[in-house]
Amino acid sequence: MSQPVQRAAARSFLQKYINKETLKYIFTTHFWGPVSNFGIPIAAIYDLKKDPTLISGPMTFALVTYSGVFMKYALSVSPKNYLLFGCHLINETAQLAQGYRFLKYTYFTTDEEKKALDKEWKEKEKTGKQ
């Protein structure tokens, strides 16, 4: 690409994405709240690989409820906060998966299967693989 074309492309990009409105949005809680809140779904996704005995049923239920409420809130405020909605949608999905794992292990796994799973998780813990 020639230099004038590169300059024109850069100028176009800057005018479109780096303007007063974008900067104004980036410096608001509408942006930084959801960005900082992404730690919860990231942790939930990471925990999907961990031992199901570590899952807290009440906490998982609380986080499912919390994410559901805030998804509704994100679409109820004006202007709609799609970043917050996306954060809680990801968290809702991860927490529902954790809830499934909790219910499956706690209520639908026989004692023999639990012993085998516990042995498997202890082996993984020893080798450091998860």
From Swiss-Prot:
Superkingdom field: Eukaryota
Main localization (coarse): mitochondrion
InterPro entries according to UniProt: MPC
Subcellular location: Mitochondrion; Mitochondrion inner membrane
Transmembrane segments: 23-45, 55-77
GO molecular function: pyruvate transmembrane transporter activity
UniProt family annotation: Belongs to the mitochondrial pyruvate carrier (MPC) (TC 2.A.105) family.
Note: Present with 396 molecules/cell in log phase SD medium.
Protein name per its UniProtKB record: Mitochondrial pyruvate carrier 1
Organism: Saccharomyces cerevisiae (strain ATCC 204508 / S288c)
Lineage of producing organism: Eukaryota, Fungi, Dikarya, Ascomycota, Saccharomycotina
Designated gene of the protein: MPC1
